[in-house]
């Protein structure tokens, strides 16, 4: 349209030529489309482009969208076409009724790369011609047929989307499902005969005036000349705008009602001055011109002359303004849009006087144009209703709803009103919903138009802005009253408002020349923006001084509306400036435009201020419209009456903006309007192009700029009911233009606040009456087809559907009939609100634009009204992007659309609900106490929820809604079931853009029904809803992420919690409505939730609820059915594999998605509470798993959940039936045969088991493939899953112990050979033998035979063991600490001790490879073994030790793998046995050997054992990556010097094995803790393992491991120290103590590793068990140290005596030795005492410095903590504690001279050889010495021993309780480093252990210093996790 030439149209008398000129002016082409079908010329826009497509096999590569634009009823009945034709042929134009719905067809989608794409066809291009054949008048199917029937080439003439007025105007509707922008050329749409019904009375009035084109000499005439104004005589083919003074009833037409007929050949819209102006003029009907069809009209509008032809010649200012509008179009290209508006823009500009403008220039003649009614002349009908009915019948058989609305309105409205209105209609027939005469002062009668017409009250605007036919129809029906609003909207929309140049003629008639401010395509495109322009336009129309009016309008303009940059305050002074070419400044220009007529200026003040200025405001700021203002305009009809006559100040005050708009009248008002206009201008900036169509138009355009406001503020059309009398806007427009200057002025002067108040009052009245909204609702009902109406509707926004409904119910809705209606500002209120929120408006439009206008209108009205209310009542309404007024739209909004009755239907759903607001408008959460639950009667209407205290008769519907009602807009809302917000049941959460609410329904069905209804109503506007929903969803996601980051455990614990991610509250709420257990991330949460839900609970439904609420938090509901504990075939199946349980599928996928790089995945336990909660939720038959729930964020919980699932299977995955077969098959010696047998057995599994196993093994293989990252090698995974998958239903301890290696190996093999096992190629020979050997199988499988005899003894442990074996879930961190656990540990230790003894008797030469970790262990073990063996030959007990080693290795690998829990038990028992047992080396080594399996240090009793143990410890340390190996080495070395050393070696070896086993099973710290192994820790670990089996989560150690830090427990710390010191003491005293200690550490570590708790035991800084925690980086790092240490210790073991080792230990622990110096000589009694103490300490697990041991323990614990080890398990070994104390003493003394350490070592030496000396005594002495800081260097033997022991003891020296923890820690940490210091050999050993790297003491200390096994160098102490823990 911008290209439209501003050709001066011929005299108005020559409509046709002006029309054509106009079209040419606008487009530079004939505006045939707009002008009339006969003038089917290109658009006035730059014009259609031709696209040639060649057919391909895929077709032409594009799809079309159908958008039917229904001409307004008024247009049809008024025969706007006829009028246009008549104007061209004077009323002989095609009858409006001939106007058929215009099928606008535009490109929906272009296939990329297709012919269309290549040809440049774009989505949104409107199809104008197909192969040269116009699509206008053709149905969609016909067009499709044309295209499909085309030859290989298809030639399309398309209007680019950006230039397609229909789409621009109906941007919202066009893309709604029911509203496609008309894609055909508007020119094809037959120009509706001018719908200008010259009102007999107002015939000369406004309509005629505006239509009359002033002499071409006049500025207006010039504008017209530039833009031919189509007078009745001038009948452009497309559309022309004729301003016809619509004589309202003389009374009402205080001002001549100028109805500008925008005559589009296709659509004749009488541009009634915006309802503001024209509303009174009685015909919104004139708007009947379909907005969509308006395109032609718009093009026609280009004809300024028509505008000029406005009937009122009196106005000094030529109507040229209208013409300028056309030019504006040209300039802004908006004109093009106006054409798309159908008659509005162009018609407004070129509006032939409809009948009159074309027929006769005289203002009065606008009615005269016989065509206005085309077939139906409103004048011929006594009542508007009749007219509308007939017209509808003729036109289209108008939409049902429209008809109903019209009928209702007509019925309610008085004939007089309609007659009065009719003239306006006449003017506005073509495009104007109602012409000014329709709207004009016949406000009441005008109100009689159909509500929809009322709604379309601003016919001019609407005309200019193509509306859906329904809108047009509505406008026509409601035109008189709504004209203003509609015109307004249209103006606002148009941006180029055809400024209704309303000149108040001397007779008081105003010429309303709608100068179309350049309504830009964009504006056109976005109905909202355009509508504000329309509003501005209407405002300008309404205000005599458009220029000024825009200003006031601006003030009214909604803030949301952008004021076009050009749109400056439309100053009344600009009345004449209207001519000025600059459209956007046009706000003032518009004022000028309005001012063009002096009368107009005056009148504009009232009218303009009311109509026009609101228009501007509405347009510009319909937002500003002060919603009240627009709404006032909406109610304008009433106000309009008032305006017309009294222009009720209040009404106009709403319109005060309008008043302000009348520039001349009230400059201040203008200022406001200017503001608003700016908004409008912003909206209409695009429109502005249209604004400047003609020079004068340009001037006017400046004024019009308001109208062009980019932001199309939906001017709230007064609901017809609301303003039964012409809407204020009508009044303001028409009266302002025509008659009431003073009144307008008065109104204008009302401040926005006053207007708002008035508006609010009106709304209230409307609510009260229930009828006030009727008119408004209709007016506000957005037409689906017409974006304008929606915008108008938005303007009117407050008119709720209920109002519409009430209209149907009551005559009040009729604008004409109910002048008071204006009092109800509802429609007015939010129209601009809607505009403010384009998004809202679109949604509303979409909602409204649901094909059925009435519905959409209804909803729109409701929406807008609601919005207005909300806007007035609550600022949040705007936020609500939701049109709150939309409530009226029923769930079946479509049905509502279908019929008026639907429109008037009450509510979609209503009923009592408990309601609580969760967040305030500011997004702040509201506590229940502040806003408790309240029972409210909730009515769902359209897109709004009305909350009432009690059920009210819904007479007023939403319009009747009382102030007390709370309105919640639901457009774009998110609604979901709330589980976390409250404990209440059946609660659903409604989240709007700004607030959150909870509603409690009576039952689930009711809740679901509400949710469905709200979703349906809230999503009526797909586009906007999607946008709003996206915003909300994004907001929720952000909140969710915040919540997750802040509290990952705060997810809703609802069984489903399916939408938690969307829950904004979730972050804030911890309670669940159900009172169901929260995801037990923490019990605290649940209590918090309970607290939160208190208010929710406040209205408890029943005692049961209370009971449930109170009970649930504390007790778990029994799991019934569902997923866990049921057979595989009963589990909910995965979506893609019916044989795989859903839980398995989900967990595996989540782990693969997020956990492949998670260290220790499946090893690290998850939160037991969370797991339990998830299990409960899943057991509730929740097949829909919301993996977005934060509960599914914790990978450890997910992995534990998976393990728990398999653990709880009634029939294990490998089935009870085949369990023994699998075990036997695994024991097949031939690897190939073994694999084949296993495969055969697997294939024999039931389908569910087979598929699940296949799926799981594939998953585990995937995990193992990422072992580099997650450290979970097949063996580690096998350790975790073996006992879980390969088991029997009954937890058989014997099976667990005996079959654990098999279980591990089977699973490991499955993982490694998954492809082979589950491939169909059974013939393939398994390649696993070598591979497995190389990987894990090469490692010895732990031999658990020695454990079996003790199984019975350890009655407590079976479950624990089985749990640990399961290791799926670990016991709670404190599990070891429990007295029961302690006891079970004791039992385990005893049994393990005995088993260890037996095992020692049965030496195993070669460990069996069980898993990768075992391999690692074996590697270390072998290394150590070689060393140990080297030592062993030196040792007496070499054989014995070797056996022990072999056994230990086998046991450690096999047992550890198979029975970590058992091993733990064994270790614990061994330790306890050792502790209890005499220092006899044999017993201890034996005991230690089983611990070997678990902990290599377990064998400290014999010197021989000690070296072995040292070796084992080294190995274990290597395996565990902890200090254990060092400690064990230290112990072993210390043992070495003694005879026991070989055994110790064996024990050490065993310890290493145990450690490795442990490490294998529990990736964490078994090795680390090996030195610190303690019988108690072991037992607890066994228990924890057992528990872990029962519980979902893995043990703490695993968690610690997952954290990447050595997992330690207090017991472990104790164990470390104990192991070290104990081993040392045992080695020295009995050489067995330390090994046992180490063994304990290992055992403990092993169990903990198994469980995850063991890891803590590995606490010795040597957590490096790479094997144990291959997965753990820490463990690997530590393993390196361990290896070094192990090697060193091994070396020391090999060659050095226990004394050397002892020295090494001393050296490493030199600082501590100070304290322990006194205890240099361990005494056996002391040893036993130490054991006792240790037991005591164990019982006292948490005692800090018990006997000084506690303090050391504490220190060790600190050290471990320093190492980031959080978990505290009960300290397991009292012996260790004592030793820990010693160790602490060493640590303390470590700083002291190494001499002292040497002394201590020396003291210890005597003990070392005999091992009779108890380490405890020695440590005590050392401690004393430490305190005295006397340390005697120990011999190299002792150095080595101490080196080894030091490492061990660094882990757990127990004797020096007094030693400071820091020293202990230091000693522990430096153990490795000290060891190197001790001696080269010891250093090597330590280096092997990894100590050498860390050990300073080794290097720093002399061998003598290191000789003190209990002394750890500061480094060792620091390194020692135990110390850190302490």
Swiss-Prot record:
Which segment of the chain is annotated as a signal peptide? none
Q: Which SUPFAM superfamilies match?
A: GTPase activation domain, GAP, PDZ domain-like, PH domain-like
- Spell out the Low complexity composition-biased ranges: 441-451
**Cystines in this chain:** none
Q: Domain Rho-GAP, which positions?
A: 1126-1318
Where mainly located? Golgi
The record places domain PDZ at 77-162
Q: Name one GO molecular function term.
A: GTPase activator activity
| Chain's role | GTPase-activating protein (GAP) for rhoa and cdc42.
Instruction: Give the protein's recorded name.
Output: Rho GTPase-activating protein 21-A
Q: What is the lineage of its organism?
A: Eukaryota, Metazoa, Chordata, Craniata, Vertebrata
Gene from which the chain derives: arhgap21-a
